[in-house]
Amino acid sequence: MKYAIIAAGEGSRLAEEGISVPKPLVKVAGQCLVDRLIRVFMANDAEEIVVVCNDLTPLVDEHLRMIERDGFEGRMIPLRHIVRTTPSSMHSFYELSEFLKDSPFVLTTVDTIFRDEEFADYIAAFKASLADGSADGMMGVTDYVDDEKPLYVTPLPVPPRGEAGECQFPLIGNFLDADPDGVCPYISGGIYGLTPKAIDTLNRCMAEGKSRMRNFQRGLIEDGLRLLAFPFSKVLDIDHAKDVEKAEEFLRTRPLTRPSGTLSPRGEGKVSTSNQEK
């Protein structure tokens, strides 16, 4: 499995709140955000990890060069990175796309926080969907709302016969900016399991002058790609200084139950002032 990390954001809100290091090097539970993802990806059969970082500071570039040269946690890492400063996360994805055209991959932003064991379950489910041909992608979703501008996920009521088959994870019908009636069961978690088909959609979105990952996700639906929803108990972002403590507390606690593949109305979530795009 290939993995890709978008680490090209400015992290301006963290800087304004007194965190001086670039976001990819912010530590959660004693580990830099980018290192945490590398560790998790290596634990889930990473064939290659590609990262895009910006050129606003040399620190992230230098850190990734060191890992490429010296390895990480006692072993060499199949890591490559590029340095680009881009106007949106979709543009960052586009810069990575040349490395993602020949096999399935999982993409996320550098500050996405989830439980390791849930991610392992997600990867197993994504691989199973690829093996049986039930989907063109699997998106991580959550019913925990901690985002000022969440992207709501609407499932299809009944998976089309012969497409999703017996798969326990429902197909996604659309991605919406608003859910005034509270009927959408989940929001996007910013974890994207995709096949090379998605690159065609990305290229179309770029040609049409679109930006933001949410518009790319809607483009996938417009192009007829079959996307399954995999529920995580929580997915958090590190956008503010207080989010570091929140993430560490989340990782310390254990869930009472694992979410199932059946989508139901959202649970009670705490709405923050984050505007991390999904």
What do the PLM-derived regions correspond to, one by one?
Residues 20-35:
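Short catalytic helix/loop segments, enriched in acidic residues and glycine
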Residues 120-123, 167-236, 242-255:
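Catalytic-core segments of class I nucleotidyltransferases/pyrophosphorylases
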Residues 55, 108, 193-194, 239:
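A conserved hydrophobic position in a structured secondary element of the catalytic/binding core
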Residues 117-149:
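Conserved donor-nucleotide/metal-binding helix-loop-beta segment in metal-dependent transferases, i.e.
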Residues 2-5, 13, 31-109, 113, ...:
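Conserved N-terminal catalytic core of the sugar/cofactor nucleotidyltransferase
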Residues 1-19, 225:
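N-terminal nucleotide-binding beta1-loop-alpha1 segment
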